[in-house]
């Protein structure tokens, strides 16, 4: 228990440095709220004086002066409150802006393993909802952490100066109300934590369903997905209802205690007035102080609730910061080889998986060769790409790449040697030029861009666009067809010169003729580049020097197209299923 408390304290301290640069606002916000509270505490005393002294004596001049003073306090209080809100908001927004900036930078530096563990949907929620919750909590804290206690305890002190005997009722009421607030807070904390987890689950499901909507419809899984989403949504609803039921008890319980105290104060006050120990104005002042305490305790209830949610959000964010960032300067074990790619008895299992995704894979590729990779769904093709780009490291065996017989010295150098065109063609809003030079710091000439477009078989449609290289690209490349997007992403990879080029099923939207021209151009123009093409089509791999056949993580073959066709039953079955006419012949 103590260890957990120390961990939470360390986590909160880790986020406190974001107040740096906003120290003035952090001090002035609560300070102005303190002034506002002081002005409010004077109002009941002024009203009591009007009732007890001015009205009985019909002193109009004095009455006008007191009413004017009340208006002055109201105007000054409004100005002070607005000023306090400005400073509090500035500190909260500034804090969150820097926090969000650093959190985004941290997320971008996480390893693939950590991103998979935290999940994309959870990271999005932490970057948006959690940071906003922290901003709300800070804003409310700076506005209320001095104001509410000052008014509560100030009202008790002022009540004591009026009637020490009746102050006991005030103290008893405050103790009971604090007990209600903190009991509810203790009950609500774990529920709010579960609500955050339920939110992550819904966001993750929504993201998956939107991205895979075509597949879901194609396989008739719409009803099943709707049922799964409804179940997750119901869990979220149940948690919100449970939290709502508990939090809704706070207000009626508070009013019950306060109104009970109010009846007691009025009853005792009436007796005190009858004995001549208390005036009517003083009783009115006591009632006003009682209502002020009620208002501030309700605000404190909201503050405690907001802070609890903020602490939960802060905990989720610090979990991200506690992850080690990927260090591109990490030194790798050096080795030498005549091959460009050497895989020796490699086995890899994902951290959350029970079975290996790749098991005992063994092959080697010469520099400038064309390696084809084929296999069914779940065979391990995408896993191989993640290992080739060093997003993961195999638990057994080894995988190494070489240039001029030497392996890369650092993780950053390894990544710079490998260009990957992913399955999903991603284009960003901007221009064709801005997409082609994405991530490249050195200046790239137009000739180099056109050469990459020529090789990728994209120069024909780019030249027809208005503005050509400076033609507009909409978000996600929506103004291009699937095949055009794939060719542009391949061209982008070619602009960033590297000795290895991996096409992860990134020619699937191209017709056979265009694909053949593209692969031929890469072979002719980039003779030193080692090409790895992952494809579902055997026709795409005919020209490959070697083809790696995978099935459920196991290597079933490693040979040329013709050799596999003669020797491997699985490859032959795949090929003939795609070319029925050859089988019949």
Q: Where are each of the predicted segments found?
A:
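Hydrophobic/aromatic residues in alpha-helical transmembrane segments
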Residues: 43, 47, 84, 88, ...
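Short intracellular "coupling" helices and adjacent cytoplasmic loop segments at the cytosolic face
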Residues: 3-7, 57, 93, 101-125, ...
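Transmembrane helices of ABC transporter permease
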Residues: 21, 25-38, 73, 79, ...
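ABC-type nucleotide-binding domain
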Residues: 336-585
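Alpha-helical segments in transporter systems
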Residues: 24-45, 66, 70, 85-89, ...
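An intracellular "coupling" helix at the cytosolic face of ABC transporter transmembrane type-1 domains
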Residues: 20-24, 109-113, 129-138, 142, ...
């Amino acid at each position: 228990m103590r260890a957990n408390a120390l961990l939470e304290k360390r986590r909160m301290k880790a986020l406190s440095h974001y107040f740096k640069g906003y120290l003035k606002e952090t001090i002035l916000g609560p300070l102005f709220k303190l002034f506002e509270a002081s002005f409010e505490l004077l109002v009941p005393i002024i009203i009591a004086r009007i009732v007890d002294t001015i009205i009985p004596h019909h002193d109009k001049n004095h009455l006008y002066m007191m009413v004017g003073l009340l208006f002055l306090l109201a105007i000054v209080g409004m100005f002070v409150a607005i000023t306090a809100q400005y400073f509090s908001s500035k500190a909260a927004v500034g804090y969150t802006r820097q926090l969000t900036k650093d959190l985004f930078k941290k997320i971008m530096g996480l390893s693939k393993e950590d991103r998979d563990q935290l999940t994309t949907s959870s990271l999005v929620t932490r970057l948006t909802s959690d940071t906003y919750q922290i901003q709300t909590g800070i804003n409310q804290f700076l506005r209320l952490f001095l104001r509410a206690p000052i008014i509560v305890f100030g009202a008790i002190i002022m009540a004591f100066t009026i009637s020490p005997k009746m102050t006991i009722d005030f103290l008893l009421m405050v103790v009971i109300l604090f007990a209600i607030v903190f009991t509810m807070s203790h009950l609500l904390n774990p529920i709010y934590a579960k609500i955050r987890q339920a939110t992550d689950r819904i966001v993750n499901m929504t993201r998956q369903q939107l991205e895979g909507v075509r597949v879901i419809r194609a396989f008739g899984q719409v009803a099943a997905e709707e049922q799964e989403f409804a179940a997750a949504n119901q869990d979220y609803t149940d948690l919100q209802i449970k939290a709502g039921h508990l939090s809704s008890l706070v207000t009626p319980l508070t009013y019950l205690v306060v109104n009970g105290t109010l009846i007691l104060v009025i009853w005792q006050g009436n007796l005190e007035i009858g004995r001549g120990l208390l005036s009517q104005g003083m009783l009115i002042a006591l009632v006003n102080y009682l209502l002020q305490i009620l208002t501030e305790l309700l605000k404190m209830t909201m503050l405690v609730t907001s802070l609890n949610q903020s602490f939960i959000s802060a905990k989720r964010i610090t979990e991200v910061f506690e992850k080690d960032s990927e260090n591109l300067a990490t030194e790798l074990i050096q080795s030498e080889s005549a091959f460009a790619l050497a895989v020796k008895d490699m086995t890899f299992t994902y951290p959350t998986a029970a079975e290996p995704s790749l098991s005992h894979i063994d092959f080697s590729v010469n520099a400038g060769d064309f390696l084809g990779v084929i296999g069914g769904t779940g065979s391990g093709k995408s896993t191989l790409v993640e290992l080739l780009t060093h997003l993961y490291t195999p638990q057994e065996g080894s995988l190494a790449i070489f240039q001029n017989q030497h392996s890369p010295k650092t993780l950053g150098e390894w990544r710079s040697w490998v260009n990957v065109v992913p399955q999903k063609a991603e284009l960003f809003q901007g221009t064709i030029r801005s997409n082609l030079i994405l991530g490249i710091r050195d200046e790239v000439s137009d000739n180099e861009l056109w050469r990459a477009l020529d090789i990728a078989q994209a120069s024909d449609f780019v030249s027809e666009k208005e503005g050509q290289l400076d033609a507009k690209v909409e978000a996600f490349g929506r103004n291009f067809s699937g095949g055009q997007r794939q060719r542009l992403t391949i061209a982008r990879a070619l602009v960033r010169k590297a000795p290895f080029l991996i096409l992860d099923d990134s020619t699937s939207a191209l017709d056979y003729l265009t694909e053949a021209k593209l692969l031929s151009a890469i072979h002719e123009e980039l003779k030193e580049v080692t090409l790895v093409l992952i494809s579902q089509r055997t026709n795409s791999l005919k020209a490959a020097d070697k083809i790696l056949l995978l099935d459920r993580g196991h290597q079933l073959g490693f040979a040329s197209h013709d050799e596999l066709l003669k020797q491997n039953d699985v490859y032959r079955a795949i090929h003939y299923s795609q070319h029925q006419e050859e089988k019949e012949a």
